[in-house]
Amino acid sequence: MGCGHVGLVTGGCLAAIGHHVICADRDAERIRLLQEGRLPLYEPHLNELILRTSADGSLTFTADAAGALRSADAIFLCIGVPQLENGESDFAALDSAAIQIAHAVDSPKLIVERSTVPVKTGEQLKHLLRVTTPSSRADFRVAANPQFLREGTAVDDFFHPERVLLGLDDAESEATLRQIYAPILQQDFHCPIHAESCPPRKLPELLLASVRSAELIKQASNAFLAVKISYANVLADLCERLGGDVQEVTHAVGLDPRIRPSFLQAGIGFGGERLPKDLRAFCKLLEAEGVDAAIPKAAEHVNLARTEIFFQKTERSLWVLKHKKIALLGLSHKAATDDIRSSPAIDLYKRLTAAGALVTAFDPQAISNAHAAFPGLVSCRDAYEAAERADALLILTEWDEFRVLDWPRIRGIMARPLVLDGRNLLSPHYMKSLGFEYHSVGRPD
């Protein structure tokens, strides 16, 4: 249930490893698009996966979930729990799905939490299902199977995970989920995203926990990743004051096997729908339970300051922003996605336009979503059009194609050869050799 990013990746991948999957969503227009073979979001390999599994009948879509719910062996809830303005969790969509299940089914069912949910959600679901279901019609088991899918690599993350986490309170649920995930756990399936068989991969570790522990593991994991990113950004600020190079520092620190290099990249901060929300939810959980939330709160504070720091760096470089033409390369919160939710690039776009700058933008995938949110956005067909006669060019998303642009050409078409690299994508030595004034994050100018 739910045809967003998590639901489509989970449904498409489960269908690809041999299961019959029905994806249900109350958004009839979204279902219509999916039935026509049109994906409403960008995720590498997902479109071909959906088309292939839809064509062979292993994956279908419906806006009327009742029949699918009755015939299902397991019901995966791929429905997020957003936050209200006051920081409280909004369970409306999840509760609505639970009520729909309770009214539709007439036999015992396994309900699986797939999207990230607050701790104790499983118990709330059980209670809601019990009080909503007509007496003696059905018995429900609730399990947690948190997803660890990164936007941009989600399909590969599903097929080749480091671990599969199952939160369980009964043996029957464990048996069902072991059977569902057997091809993944054994790495015994034809990989649909490679022309030939997949290269050998290490078998994923199966982790069994209680439902409550599994819910906590997911929140704690995301909060820790946020702390690592913010720690790298604190190091970047320190390097700028001391004349050090944050990439040299984080590379050396990350070689320690106790730390590892992932998520130690300095820049303009993290965004997206999940990490900021999960960090706030984790802080709120700690406070509610009387536990010191200083560390995750500090990570949130550091992250919220990143775009202001980069905005000030841009302002110092240009002196006056009003009427200056500024080109933005990248609008999505990270590469390989069209997701602009909580994107640092979007925050900078709003700050720059509010200051009177004339902003042009290019993103390989996120322009449509950006236009929907900001109809006045001046978008360009490529990076060169965006850079033409620009007083400054800001790199805000780490798209690989930005690394290999014809930078001498861009040098020739800009009004002023000023580049501010918010993702440390380019070599300072190379850019300066071309005659650019080049500033990045935590590296010597």
Residue spans for each PLM region:
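Structural/interface elements that position substrates and couple domains in central-metabolism enzymes
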Residues: 1-445
